[in-house]
């Protein structure tokens, strides 16, 4: 079983948004979203190692950029 692509893309988007966000209150909101997605992934039975692999997957980043552009995000 693999983490659903949609969750992987949402996780990367949440990370990007957090990095780009300015201000403590805004950072708290983006961090909350990262935790929500992490919880969804964990609820599917995946662990910390699986979540770390998302950020290391270069092919996923290519698909992420294409997805982000197609969604105008």
Over which residues does each language-model region extend?
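Short intrinsically disordered terminal tails
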Residues: 1-2, 66-73
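N-terminal acidic leader/helix
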Residues: 1-28
